[in-house]
Amino acid sequence: MPDTTSVSDSFKTGPPGPAYRGPMTPRFDAIGLVVSDMAASVTFYRRLGFGFPEDAENQPHTEAQLPGGLRLLLDTEDTIRSFHPGWQAPGGGNRAALALLCDDPAEVDRVYEELVGAGHHGELKPWDAFWGQRYAVLHDPDGNGVDLFAPLVL
């Protein structure tokens, strides 16, 4: 019969520090968005230059590789509910936005006008911000903020 009077080494308290004999190295890898309409979202982000695979608009999950190794992940609401049945879409105001650096101020204007002209919501028209950028805000099909910006002085 095992000795149950001693506590397993796994549960003994020890000095503060990493639990696995070395620092963990989590690193920023991806930005994930839950979308209500995959086709509309893929179309929107492709217009901004994101390289989603062919037929991505018909998939429950898709990814676009970003410069520098990051990825933009899109999942349908049904995909999230398949492993988290109680998941509810957030309510209230949006608290996060994607910020996209444009080549120059003219590109901020051009991209904003193209997407608004295609029927997407323009939240804040391009303007010369006091912090030294040409700046505009759009909403993706799910209402997520997408900021467009470029330095005013190159």
Feature locations, PLM:
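Core segments of cupin and vicinal oxygen chelate
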Residues: 33-81
